[in-house]
UniProtKB/Swiss-Prot annotation:
Keyword set includes Nucleotide-binding: no
Protein name: Outer capsid protein VP4
Family classification: Belongs to the rotavirus VP4 family.
GO biological process: permeabilization of host organelle membrane involved in viral entry into host cell; virion attachment to host cell
C-alpha cells in the first residue's frame, strides 16, 4: 500500500527529544484551525429555525377564501364565486349587462307575512311583494327584468340561516344558489354580453375560486370560519386585489442584518418544480412469460423557465421512499404469467424532489436558517403497460393515481456526473386517488396507488408551482477575497518557494484521475519511488532521506507515535474517569486515551460528540499499527502526494522534506473511522460526528460509546473512505447488495475500482472530495 512510505518514516523517527516534544505540544495547544467547507459542502442536516423570517404572499398558491371586500361596483372575474355576507335586510346586490338583463337580490328577515316593500333598485323606487314564513332562516329573493323600464319578477329564492349567498359568472351564464341550506341547488341566468356584466354589492363579500365550489357550499350551509366573525377582520377595497399583479417583490433579496464582514440575506423566490419518475422493468429468463422486478429509480431532470423575466436553469432529482411490494403469480407452469415484484406508492409512501437552480439563492446555500416553502398539490396518474407474451393474450397494467401534498423542505445535496450541488429537498406525502389500477386478463383489479410500471403516463414531466424563502449568511462584500501574504522569516527564500509550491500542489488536485489514483494507492511506495521523478534525486537519495527523516521526526504524527509508545507501557496511569458519567477513557487502553489531551478537556468529555472526537483523533495511529487489506486515508494521501510530485514543475530536493512532512499532517484533515461488530457498524469522525447503523439496511441504532471504545481496543480500525452519508446516498439512489455494502465498509479497493470504472457519480464525487482535501 502507498502508506508504506509513512510507516517507513515512522519506524525510523518515532523517538523524539524532550525539547522537541514540549515544543510540539505547545504548538498543538495554541494552533487555531479553520476548516473551509468549500463551495459544495455537505449540508444534510435540517437548519435551526432562529426566527420567523419573512415570507411574502404571491398568487402561485391561491387562497380558498379571499376577502372580505367592501361594498363596490365591479366586473367580477369569471369562474369565481362572489360570496355575499349581508348583515341586515334590504338590497344585497344588483347586476346588469346594460342590454337585456337587470338582476337584483333582496334579503328578507324571518317571520315576515306577505307584504309589499319599497326597494331602490338601479336608482328607481320599486314596489316588491315579499314574504318569509321561516322562523329561523333568512330569505334571499332573486329578481329579474329584461327592460330598464319593465317590472321585476321573482326568479328564485334561497333560505339561509348563516345569511350567505353566492353568485358566479361561468360558461356564458350567471349562476346563483337557490333552495334551502343543506339541500342547495344551483340556478343559472342566461344572459348576453356576458363579459361586460357588472355587479354592485351593498354588503361585504368574499371571492372563492370555482375549484373550491364545495367549500363555498359548505360556508353557505354552515357559516364562515370563526376567524371571519371577529372584529379583527376588516373588509378592504376590491382594488387591493390589483396589487398582487405587481409580483416583482415576491422574488427579492432582502438584507436582514449586516456587519463589516457578514450579512444575512433573505431570498424569496417563486419556484416551478418539474420532475419525472424513472423505473426499471426487468424480465426473468426462460420462455418470456415472467418478470422479476418493476421498481422505481431516481430520475434527474434539467429544464429552463422564466422567473420575473429572468431565464432560470433548474435541475431536479426525484426519488421515492416507503414503497409497497406487490406480486402476481398466474401459476406454476413455465408458460404462466408471473410478476415476482412490482412496486406501488400509496398513503404510507413519500416522494422526494431535490431542486437546484442557477439563481443567486443557491450560490450561497451553506449557512441557512428560516427555511420555508409553500407548494401546490399535483396529481400523478399512471399509464398503460403491455406485457408482451410470446403466445396468448397480452396482460395490460393500467391506471393508478396519487396526489402529492407538500410535507416539508430541508437542505440536501444533489450529485451529478460532474459536480455536487447544494439544493432543497421537497418532501411530499401521498393520498390515493381515482382511478384504481388493475392488470387486465388477471384477477388483479381495484387496487389503489401508483405502480412503477408507467408512472409518468407518457408525460415529459409533472409540474408544481409555489414559492420558498430562506435566510443565508454570506460575505458583506460579494467581491471580497481573503488576502494571502508570505511570512517574513529567516527562511524567507525557502518559505517563498514553499508558498509557490503549495499553490501549485493545490491546483494540481483538479488534474488527478480518480481511476489512476486508486491503482497508485495500492502500490508499495518507498522513499526512492516517491522521489524518483525528481531530477538528480538518485545521486542525493541518501542525504535527502536523512533530511526527510530529520524533518519528519518533529511532525505531529511522529510525536503522537512516541506518546503512544510510552502510554502502552503504562496505559492505566493516564486514564481519567468521571464520577457521574462513565467516560470513554474507562477502557484501559492506550488507543482510547489521548495522553495529556484528555486531562485538558476533562470538564467537557461528558458529551458523546466530545468523547468520540477524542477517540477518533487517535484512530489513525491504531490503523497504522494494525494494517488491514482495505485501503486507508494514508494510501490516498501518499498516492496524491506522489502524483503531485511527479506533475510539479517547481519541486526541488531542498523542499522535499517540508512537503512530505506537511502532507503527512495536513492531507485529508476531515477523516472518519469505523469498527465492525457482526452486523453493527460504529463510525466516528475527527470533527465529533458519529453514527451507528446496521449493514444491510443502514438503519440507525443507538451509539454505545463504551462498546465503541472497547471495539477500538480489540478490533481492526478501518478508514471510512466511503463514509456513512455517501453509503446511504448510494443505497437510496442506486441500491447496493449486502456484499457490496460490506466491501465498501471494509474499503475494499477492488470494489472501489469497479464503482469508479462504472462512472458512479456518488463514489467518484467522494474520492474527488478526498483529493481536494489533500491541500498544503
Amino acid at each position: 500500500m502507498a502508506s508504506l512510505i509513512y510507516r517507513q518514516l515512522l519506524a525510523n523517527s518515532y523517538t523524539v527529544d524532550l525539547s522537541d516534544e514540549i515544543e510540539n505540544i505547545g504548538y498543538a495547544k495554541s494552533k487555531n484551525v479553520t476548516i473551509n467547507p468549500g463551495p459544495f459542502a455537505q449540508t444534510g442536516y435540517t437548519p435551526v429555525n432562529w426566527g420567523p423570517g419573512e415570507v411574502n404572499d404571491s398568487t402561485t398558491v391561491e387562497p380558498i377564501l379571499d376577502g372580505p371586500y367592501q361594498p363596490t361596483n365591479f366586473n367580477p372575474p369569471v369562474n369565481y364565486w362572489m360570496l355575499l355576507s349581508p348583515l341586515n335586510a334590504g338590497v344585497v346586490v344588483e347586476g346588469t349587462n346594460s342590454i337585456d338583463r337587470w338582476l337584483a337580490t333582496v334579503l328578507v328577515e324571518p317571520n315576515v307575512l306577505t307584504t309589499v316593500r319599497t326597494y331602490t333598485l338601479f336608482g328607481v323606487q320599486e314596489q316588491i311583494s315579499v314574504e318569509n314564513n321561516s322562523t329561523t332562516k333568512w330569505k334571499f329573493i332573486n329578481l329579474i327584468k329584461t327592460t330598464l323600464s319593465g317590472n321585476f319578477t321573482l326568479y328564485s329564492t334561497l333560505l339561509s340561516e348563516p345569511k350567505l349567498h353566492g353568485i358566479m359568472k361561468h360558461g356564458g351564464q350567471l349562476w346563483v344558489y337557490n333552495g334551502e341550506t343543506q339541500t342547495l341547488l344551483l340556478q343559472d341566468y342566461v344572459t348576453s354580453n356576458y363579459d361586460s356584466l357588472t355587479m354592485t354589492s351593498f354588503c361585504d363579500f368574499y371571492i372563492i375560486p370555482r375549484s373550491q365550489e364545495s367549500t363555498c357550499t359548505e360556508y353557505i350551509n354552515n357559516g364562515l370560519p370563526p376567524i371571519q366573525n371577529t372584529r379583527n377582520v376588516v373588509s378592504v377595497s376590491i382594488s387591493s386585489r390589483n396589487i398582487i399583479l405587481n409580483r416583482a417583490q415576491v422574488n427579492k433579496d432582502i438584507v436582514i442584518s449586516k456587519t463589516s464582514l457578514w450579512k444575512e440575506v433573505q431570498y424569496n423566490r417563486d419556484i416551478t418544480i418539474r420532475f419525472r419518475f424513472a423505473n426499471a422493468i426487468i424480465k426473468s429468463g426462460g420462455l418470456g412469460y415472467k418478470w422479476s422486478e418493476i421498481s422505481f429509480k431516481p430520475a434527474n431532470y434539467q429544464y429552463s423557465y422564466t422567473r420575473d423575466g429572468e431565464e432560470i436553469t433548474a435541475h431536479t432529482t426525484c426519488s421515492v421512499n416507503g414503497v409497497n411490494d406487490f406480486s402476481f403469480n398466474g401459476g406454476s407452469n413455465p408458460t404462466d404469467f408471473l410478476i415476482s415484484r412490482y412496486e406501488v406508492i400509496k398513503e404510507n409512501s413519500y416522494v422526494y424532489v431535490d431542486y437546484w437552480d442557477d439563481s443567486q439563492a443557491f450560490r450561497n446555500m451553506v449557512y441557512v436558517r428560516s427555511l420555508a416553502a409553500n407548494l401546490n398539490d399535483v396529481l400523478c396518474t399512471g399509464g398503460d403497460y403491455t406485457f408482451a407474451l410470446p403466445v396468448g393474450q397480452w396482460p395490460v397494467m393500467t391506471g393508478g393515481a396519487v396526489m402529492l401534498h407538500a410535507a416539508g423542505v430541508t437542505l440536501s445535496t444533489q450529485f451529478t456526473d460532474f459536480v455536487s450541488l447544494n439544493s432543497l429537498r421537497f418532501r411530499f406525502s401521498l393520498s390515493v386517488e381515482e382511478p384504481y389500477f388493475s392488470i387486465t386478463r388477471t384477477r388483479v383489479t381495484r387496487l389503489y396507488g401508483l405502480p412503477a410500471v408507467n408512472p409518468n403516463n407518457n408525460r415529459d414531466y409533472y409540474e408544481i408551482a409555489g414559492r420558498f424563502s430562506l435566510i443565508s449568511l454570506v460575505p458583506s462584500n460579494d467581491d471580497y477575497q481573503t488576502p494571502i501574504m508570505n511570512s517574513v522569516t529567516v527562511r524567507q527564500d525557502l518559505e517563498r518557494q514553499l508558498g509557490e509550491l503549495r499553490e501549485e500542489f493545490n491546483t494540481l488536485s483538479q488534474e488527478i484521475a480518480v481511476s489512476q489514483l486508486i491503482d497508485l494507492a495500492l502500490l508499495p511506495l518507498d522513499m526512492f519511488s516517491m522521489v524518483s521523478g525528481i531530477k538528480s534525486s538518485i545521486d542525493a537519495a541518501k542525504s535527502m532521506a536523512s533530511n526527510v527523516m530529520k524533518k519528519f521526526k518533529k511532525s505531529k504524527l511522529a510525536s503522537s507515535i512516541s506518546t503512544l509508545t510510552n502510554s502502552l507501557s503504562d496505559a492505566s496511569s493516564s486514564v481519567s474517569r468521571n464520577s457521574s458519567i462513565r467516560s470513554v477513557s474507562s477502557s484501559v487502553s492506550a488507543w482510547t486515551d489521548v495522553s495529556n489531551q484528555l486531562t485538558d478537556i476533562s470538564n467537557s468529555v461528558n458529551s458523546i460528540s466530545t468523547q468520540t472526537s477524542t477517540i477518533s483523533r487517535r484512530l489513525r495511529l491504531k490503523e497504522i499499527a494494525t494494517q488491514t487489506e482495505g485501503m486507508n486515508f494514508d494510501d490516498i494521501s501518499a498516492a496524491v502526494l506522489k502524483t503531485k510530485i511527479d506533475k510539479s514543475t517547481q519541486i526541488a530536493a531542498n523542499n522535499i522534506p517540508d512537503i512530505i512532512t506537511e502532507a503527512s499532517e495536513k492531507f485529508i484533515p476531515n477523516r472518519a473511522y469505523r469498527v465492525i461488530s457482526n452486523d453493527n457498524v460504529f463510525e466516528a469522525s475527527t470533527d465529533g460526528r458519529f453514527f451507528a447503523y446496521k449493514v444491510g439496511t443502514f438503519e440507525g441504532i443507538p451509539f454505545d460509546v463504551q462498546k465503541f471504545a472497547d471495539l477500538v481496543t480489540d478490533s481492526p480500525v478501518i478508514s471510512a473512505i466511503i463514509d456513512f452519508k455517501t453509503l446511504k446516498n448510494l443505497n437510496d439512489n442506486y441500491g447496493i447488495t449486502r456484499e457490496q455494502a460490506f466491501n465498501l465498509l471494509r474499503s475494499d479497493p477492488r470494489v472501489l475500482r469497479e464503482f469508479i470504472n462504472q462512472d458512479n457519480p456518488i463514489i467518484k464525487n467522494r474520492i474527488e472530495q478526498l483529493i481536494l482535501q489533500c491541500r498544503l
